[in-house]
């Protein structure tokens, strides 16, 4: 709680007034924003749904980690629960605008992100593409995951999290922190502002080896911007 209070005090010094949105029921997630017309949706231990200006659905997530055992299937089930909750809000508000953002704790190519039963977040999607696909007679809405564009070593950093384990399968760099958006949000996204943050006003966020500095955070933060 001390860290949250310190962050809150630092945010108060920003030029823009930021409000701590209501995430009661989701102690793992805290959200600040400059929008006042914000109504909380479903609050769960692992996600917080917020309705902004009665037309934008934003869901902050902090999903199951693999540090204490693999939880691939559990994350798929949680992603399915999140999308089910969002679907009902979309129907009620008659909107298609959705942003899912946060620590998904798996990379874009893994089950919860790509599975049609999960986020169904594809690496390529255009505004004119068909917005869904049918699997065994059931229709699944497509989402878009722009984080694929930041993956790999063409530009530092290669991901948001670094971990080496004695396993045959270990990419070392992982893109655990992501933003996933609905098809309707694609033209509103400012592509140049999708970034992995490695520096802040107080200095760099990485070690001498250029890995995330766990004394600050074991994950690099991300940022994105939308014209709304």
PLM regions and their residue ranges:
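Extracytoplasmic/secreted cell-surface and envelope-processing proteins
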Residues: 7, 67-70, 108-111
């Amino acid at each position: 709680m001390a860290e949250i209070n310190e962050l809150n005090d630092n945010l108060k010094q920003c030029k823009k007034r930021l409000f701590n949105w209501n995430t009661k029921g989701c102690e793992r997630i805290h959200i600040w924003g400059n929008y006042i017309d914000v109504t909380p949706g479903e609050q769960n231990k692992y996600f917080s749904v917020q309705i902004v200006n009665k037309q934008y659905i934003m869901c902050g997530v902090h999903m199951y980690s693999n540090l204490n055992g693999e939880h691939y299937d559990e994350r798929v089930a949680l992603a399915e629960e999140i999308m089910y909750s969002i679907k009902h809000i979309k129907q009620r508000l008659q909107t298609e605008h959705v942003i899912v953002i946060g620590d998904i704790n798996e990379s874009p190519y893994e089950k919860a992100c790509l599975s049609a039963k999960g986020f169904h977040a594809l690496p390529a999607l255009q505004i004119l593409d068909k917005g869904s696909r049918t699997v065994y007679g059931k229709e699944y809405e497509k989402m878009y995951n722009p984080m694929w564009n930041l993956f790999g070593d063409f530009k530092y950093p290669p991901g948001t999290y670094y971990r080496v384990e004695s396993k045959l399968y270990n990419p070392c760099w992982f893109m655990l922190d992501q933003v996933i958006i609905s098809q309707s949000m694609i033209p509103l996204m400012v592509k140049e502002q999708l970034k992995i943050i490695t520096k802040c006003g107080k200095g760099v966020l990485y070690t001498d080896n250029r890995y995330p500095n766990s004394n600050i955070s074991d994950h690099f933060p991300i940022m994105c911007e939308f014209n709304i």
